[in-house]
Amino acid sequence: DGSYILASETCALDIIGANFIREIENGEVVVITKRGLKSYHPFPKKKVRHCIFEYIYFARPDSIVGGHSVYECRKSLGRELAKESHVEADMIIPVPDSGVPSAVGYSEESGVPFELGIIRNHYVGRTFIEPQQSIRAFSVKLKHNANRALVGGKKIVLVDDSIVRGTTSVKIVQMMRDAGASEVHMRIAAPPITHPDFYGIDTPSQDQLLAATKSLQEMGDYLGADSLSFLSVDGLYRAMGHPKGRDNDCPQYTDHCFTGDYPTNLIDEDGEQDFKQLSLLTVSNTPEQ
């Protein structure tokens, strides 16, 4: 009927039966009036660098971001993860729900069966953004339960999308142990998160990020897993369709949570030198890549 609908993800358009036309470009101003739609570009053109965490976790798997199916991207992450860190096991189990597509890809690549060894309560929200540790821990208990009849006596690979503080992972590994799993291996379909985000996402300060404070061995011991592996940064880029991996001179995505390569300079608002205090952003004076 000539109406326009704007949404942050394409899945919202699917739900109401709207047709996806295109994404609004970086720096573009779209004005919609009774006379129609007009597009303006008042700012200089910049290189498009989507946040790679949209593909890993934030976007819904049934959305299209930057022309890519989020679901297929996550399956590809799992396939690349299986190539990098295969381990002998009886089954591949996703940490639901965000770990499901990557676990499917891991299973397809490794040839190890995919099973639903964890049942999720869908009425509990995301745990990593809960403000208090006690609330996060209790939320994990409410959110997940082991499929005991399936995992007892089995060697399992748990596939998750990422690890922030490790709150969920510790509880999940112990849950699998309590359910009788003989071995529990953690495989993470993203690189270690070593730097906080200062662009509106409620990630912790750096000293609360598990991968920023512990070595790989220390993280595995902390989680209680028999082994722990993360997808490499280059593996992440290969999974996203870049065979040569990350272009370090001109990165294809913003990936500062993994690399510390922030797209803008960071200024300490209160004058403190401690990195975790950095909060105020300013446009970088460095040449645009």
Label the model's feature ranges.
Residues D1-Q289:
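PRPP-associated nucleotide enzymes
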